[in-house]
Amino acid sequence: MALDFWKSSHAQQWIFDKTEIWKQRAEDMKTYSEEEYSRLNIFWANFITAVATECAHSQANVGCKLRQQVIATAIVYFKRFYLRQSFRDMCPFLVASTALFLACKVEEHTTLSVSSFLKNTALVLPKRWGVAFETNSAKNGVLYDSEFILVEILDCCLVVHHATRPMFELLEDWKQHTLTSTNTPVKDFDQIEIQCQKVVNDTLRCDVGLMFAPHCIGLASISVGMELMGRGEELEDWLVEVDTDMDKLADCINQIYTMYQLWRSFDEKEEVKKLMAKLPKPNTPIPPPQQQQSSYHM
């Protein structure tokens, strides 16, 4: 997995340091502070997850539950798009729905109704956050045009390496290490897997996916997950033998904890309305694909 990752477009084009990330967001930083943008990161991930869940329950897609990997891929697409574009360039609600639609294709998920994503975007926002979704058109063509634009901005880099697989591989390695060194099996290993998987999913609400390799995020999620269970000391002997950059690991862990601290203090129902009130209106309507093709040279 590690070898495949380091040769991938993910590793070569979509890993940045913190300074680069905030520099690329310069246009939106004229509107939002870093803390406000970090709160928006939490909101956008929650919004995309909510739209995916709502679509799974819609009549058009009954019984079609989106896998977590589809949701995770959509969130990554969304974050990457807004490294190269600002909120003023294209409606983020439309980009979020488009990212989900594209992720379903890339992750080879069952084809979903295009109209459902538009419809459920309009349902989810007022129901959960009290925010209205305004679009000039509800026609399917709007979504297809925005899909073309999204692919263009992403440089057709659509394969995303997630932290879930390396996290499970690392957990298995730790389990075997513990059994070999202590002759005692790990207690409640299934609960540990569940907790660490939850942390991995939560990392989508901050920027670690734009900064660190999947194995680093997976290892950080294990460390945080075990600490949250009050069992962090059980990892100490094993961590000494893990071949990784400990400074990057510590940075990743710190960012996850910072995200959790911010999330706990984030009153979404009230604060999202204020954040959305500051959201810039797109400069122009979404141009047709051929016009976009001549405008972007990425």
From Swiss-Prot:
The keyword Nucleus applies. One of its GO terms (molecular function) is cyclin-dependent protein serine/threonine kinase regulator activity. Disulfide bonds: none annotated. Its main location: nucleus. Residues 278-298 are annotated as: Disordered. Residues 46-162 form the Cyclin N-terminal domain. GO terms for cellular component: mediator complex; nucleus. SMART domains: CYCLIN (SM00385). Keywords: Activator, Cyclin, Developmental protein, Nucleus, Transcription, Transcription regulation. The keyword Electron transport does not apply. It is found in: Nucleus. Transmembrane segments: none annotated. One of its GO terms (biological process) is positive regulation of transcription by RNA polymerase II. Component of the Mediator complex. Component of the Mediator complex, a coactivator involved in regulated gene transcription of nearly all RNA polymerase II-dependent genes. Mediator functions as a bridge to convey information from gene-specific regulatory proteins to the basal RNA polymerase II transcription machinery. Mediator is recruited to promoters by direct interactions with regulatory proteins and serves as a scaffold for the assembly of a functional preinitiation complex with RNA polymerase II and the general transcription factors. Belongs to the cyclin family. Cyclin C subfamily. PANTHER family: CYCLIN. This is Cyclin-C. It comes from Caenorhabditis briggsae.
